[in-house]
Amino acid sequence: MQLQKIEKKIYALSENWVGEKHIPSLIRSLNNAFKRNIVCFSSERFDDEYFDDHNIIVNAHYCARISDFIPEHIYIALHFPSERKRALITKEGAKNLAVRIIRAIHHEYRHKYQQRQRPLLSQKEYKPKPKQNRMKAMYYGNPDELDAHAYETQAEKLNINKLRRAHKISWKESEAVFMYRKTFRKQDPKVWQRFLKKVYKHGRSLSGTTRTCIDSKNQ
């Protein structure tokens, strides 16, 4: 299924998400919508604090076909606050959830493409700098993750002209750009610039716009 069709399907479903929702029913509606696709959904719980419009965490992973019992799939888990039996979703929250799901699917489809391009080959690990958070730097610095996070920004419809001042892009505008700026802009500028170029490349292919220069302020 094309990613554009997936976006339309998710946005159509999100129109019915506002209000107090029965979680199993919400998951079931998503799985029914994607029953002929490799995407599947489940629900989990979390205990951390959250914002009213960002109260559902979305995690995902791609798994290539292992056997007849474990087919190729993209698994998406929606994490709901443990304190509530039902999901309470605001209008803005429904929009945010739709973007997060679409973004996760974009990300995992990119991993699918990566594996098909070079099966069973892993990328070289990123070596964190002395003052970096080791786990975050190794995760975001991995070449496959950098490419997939850049690719997922298409789901946010990020205006690539804003990359001239990427250091001003907020978490709400693009989580990936925000996290790569926070992790690499000062600690390892080469990775930050490499990421921005990937975002620009994917964004330009989506919008068909002409090339613009990334401002030196991002360096």
Model-derived segments and their meaning:
Residues 3-11:
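Acidic/histidine-rich, surface-exposed loop or edge segments in extracytoplasmic proteins
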Residues 8, 134-145, 150-219:
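Long, well-structured alpha-helical subdomains associated
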Residues 14-38:
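Zn2+-dependent metallopeptidase catalytic core
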